[in-house]
Amino acid sequence: MKVTAVLMVAVLVLTACQLTTANTTDYVRRILARKSTMSKRYCSDSGGWCGLDPELCCNSSCFVLCG
């Protein structure tokens, strides 16, 4: 009975570790892909349209227009 309980706990811990690692790896992969596309991204001029995406303004603030 004790051996079964220990095995069940071990399986649960290993499963949790696998899920955590998988989620982190996917997150890192998406961040790296986004950075590679950002280096090729067009930067709006000051006063140009950016919507609510501050990354379009590159080095300035953004709220509908680049500041």
UniProtKB/Swiss-Prot annotation:
Disulfide bonds: 43-58, 50-62, 57-66
Signal peptide positions (record): 1-22
UniProt cross-references to InterPro entries, sorted A to Z: Conotoxin
Primary location group: secreted
Comment, domains: The presence of a 'disulfide through disulfide knot' structurally defines this protein as a knottin.
Keywords assigned by UniProt, alphabetized: Amidation, Disulfide bond, Knottin, Neurotoxin, Secreted, Signal, Toxin
Gene source species: Californiconus californicus (California cone)
A Pfam family annotated for this UniProt entry: Conotoxin
Cleaved propeptide residues: 23-39
Subcellular compartments: Secreted
Family: Belongs to the conotoxin O1 superfamily.
Protein name in the entry: Conotoxin Cl6.8
